[in-house]
Amino acid sequence: GKDVGPGVAAICTTALLKHGRSPDDPAVARSLKYLQTFVHDDGGIYSPESPVQNYETSLAIQCFAAANMDGRYKSLLAKADKFIKTIQSGGEPSEFNYGGSGYEPKKKRPDLSNTSFLLDALQASGIGPDDEAVKRALVFVSRCQNLETENNTTSFAAKNPDGGFYYTPAAGGVSEAGQTDEGGLRSYGSMTYAGLKSMIFAGVKADDPRVKAAVSWIKKHYTLSANPGMPKPAQGLYYYLHTFAKAMSAMGLDVLEDDKGIKHPWRHDLLVELAKQQRPDGSWVNVDPRFLEGNTNLVTAYALLALSYAQSGK
């Protein structure tokens, strides 16, 4: 429908493609044609006057990449990849904005969520860790972690050094989970898995202190019934479950042993949790509508994508 917009349409169509539908399947083909109506001369794929150009284009790239088995979208993808690179923050590497992506070019505050979508899109297009845009993004991602290293000299890491991730160090620093009493930015689940996944896509190895610290955090906060760390645990739950599954798959883990020594077969756990939450009509929706999770189409697509990573390991 015309009210859906390219972002939700792209994520729904990607979910169908990940579950085995062909690009020539009537529903998928119709959606791909709809998405092409949002392609701009600058290469971006977004609604007119969109305040979320990076999100929409990054989601569309992942969709067209999943439908590009015969190369039919090669030119479209090359232009879209170039667009999201051009709206990535530049400047000096010492600046906290450097390497991050935000909602649109006119809004200069980048964040980890947008930057992880950028990296997801580039990875889907086959662009690897040696690409300059990926290297720049890794600089920003490292600064979103509560870990003091040579890669992160922000003031926030020392105030809450738990290895998790938060929303952004830019513009004074923001965490959707709030601040600690010491003025640190609280880590939370969706951003920690987004940060971990982003580092893996950017070529950071498992023995790197940044990855080790992130894995340590998730071992302490393993759950699929809440977005851990958030003041209201249902907020962003399905974004979290999708990001959790994609990160765990990227790590190549089948079982996660938590900090108490309990082994969690995460794929099975995720299937059980999503089966429990599925509504009689087959859809999913969040009881907490924040972050657009009152939108049944979006939340069902998140659930289907999470299941695709649990089932295929890709």
Regions found by a protein language model. Give the residues of each.
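Active-site-surrounding "flap" and adjacent substrate/cofactor-binding loops of secreted or lumenal enzymes
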Residues: 32-38
